[in-house]
């Protein structure tokens, strides 16, 4: 079901169905040929919109597309209604975040602005080229030429408070705080975990690192990410080969739609990678990590792969506590 698309007729926007899977009862949709309509009067509209198998979002009726005709299957399962309500709340937050970024771009100049000091100083970064504005925290070493660790949070810590990302992976922070290093903690704007917004955020992270005021060793830039952050790590390593000294993507993936041929795997060979995932993860499927770990090993790349069969999408805490990924890089 994760390869389906969820479409809302209100704003004709698309997003992956994955966030809604917990709300959808098993067996309520099959074969990826389901759609949802407000009522029967909108059936013609839906037929015109359907170019491929996809979900249509509402709280009305459930239909099955079959051989060019649409068969009504009765009222919507309650779980789908919950998914649609969740989607509406999500879109409201996403639109509010987009409006905030647009406002900031119109009032702020490019670059880094310090907001407050402290152990983890607070900053705001504006990148007009990539239409992105987000807060970040920086713990700068008192000594020069120390390594930089970039920690990318999961989707649950998205926002603009410059606070939630501090608590995304406590076991990892405990490791790093014992070492003399620089730590960068960006906070992704709400809704920047998909599509063009995600790509803009990823490019902005690299640009931010280039402009950081900290005097760190630019040959020792390490990047670690969890879930959405793990996906960002894969993308950054792919887009900027040889930029990072090493990368640790946890519960992420480079190619979640499994269209592996669109990526030149040779670009990944240039960066040492330690990937970690669990086979029972239902939020971010393990397929992409399985594929690239195997292919990179065939190419003789510096790749380490921690693959577990339990803990699901909560494996990161256990991984950081027991495997000590920060020590490994």
Q: What name fits each language-model region?
A:
Residues 50-53, 62, 70, 74-148, ...:
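A domain-start/cap signature at the N-terminus of enzymes
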Residues 152-154, 251, 277:
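The conserved beta1-alpha1 loop
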Residues 276, 282, 287-293, 297-329:
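C-terminal catalytic histidine-bearing segment of alpha/beta-hydrolase fold enzymes
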Residues 1-63:
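N-terminal accessory nucleic-acid engagement/regulatory domains that precede
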Residues 270-277:
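Catalytic His-Asp charge-relay segment
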Residues 219-267:
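Primarily recognizes the serine-hydrolase "nucleophile elbow" in alpha/beta-hydrolase
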Residues 193-227:
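Gly/Ser-rich "nucleophile elbow"/oxyanion-hole loop immediately N-terminal to the catalytic nucleophile
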Residues 148, 152-203:
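Active-site machinery of serine-nucleophile hydrolases
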């Amino acid at each position: 079901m994760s390869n389906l698309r969820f479409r809302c007729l209100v704003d004709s926007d698309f997003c992956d169905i994955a966030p809604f899977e917990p709300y959808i009862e098993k067996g309520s949709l099959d074969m990826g040929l389901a759609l949802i309509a407000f009522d029967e009067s909108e059936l013609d509209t839906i037929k015109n919109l359907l170019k491929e198998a996809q979900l249509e979002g509402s709280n009305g009726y459930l239909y099955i597309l079959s051989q060019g005709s649409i068969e009504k299957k009765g009222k919507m399962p309650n779980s789908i209604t919950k998914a649609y309500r969740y989607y509406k709340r999500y879109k409201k937050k996403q639109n509010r975040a987009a409006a905030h970024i647009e406002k900031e771009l119109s009032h702020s100049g490019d670059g880094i602005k310090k907001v407050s000091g402290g152990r983890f100083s607070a900053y705001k970064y504006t990148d007009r080229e990539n239409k992105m504005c987000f807060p970040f925290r920086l713990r700068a070493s008192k000594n020069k030429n120390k390594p930089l660790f970039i920690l990318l949070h999961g989707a649950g810590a998205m926002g603009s408070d410059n606070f939630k990302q501090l608590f995304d992976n406590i076991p990892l922070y405990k490791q790093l705080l014992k070492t003399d290093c620089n730590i960068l903690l960006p906070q992704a704007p709400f809704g920047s975990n998909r599509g063009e917004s995600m790509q803009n955020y990823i490019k902005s992270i690299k640009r931010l690192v280039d402009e950081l005021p900290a005097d760190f060793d630019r040959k020792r830039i390490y990047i670690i990410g969890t879930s959405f952050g793990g996906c960002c790590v894969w993308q950054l390593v792919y887009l900027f080969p040889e930029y990072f000294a090493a990368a640790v993507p946890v519960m992420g993936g480079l190619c979640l739609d499994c269209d592996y041929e669109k990526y030149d795997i040779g670009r990944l060979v240039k960066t040492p990678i330690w990937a970690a995932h669990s086979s029972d993860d239902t939020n971010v499927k393990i397929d992409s990590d399985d594929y690239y770990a195997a292919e990179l090993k065939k190419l003789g790349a510096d790749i380490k792969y921690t693959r577990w069969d339990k803990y699901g999408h909560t494996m990161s805490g256990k991984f950081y506590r027991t495997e000590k990924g920060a020590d490994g890089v």
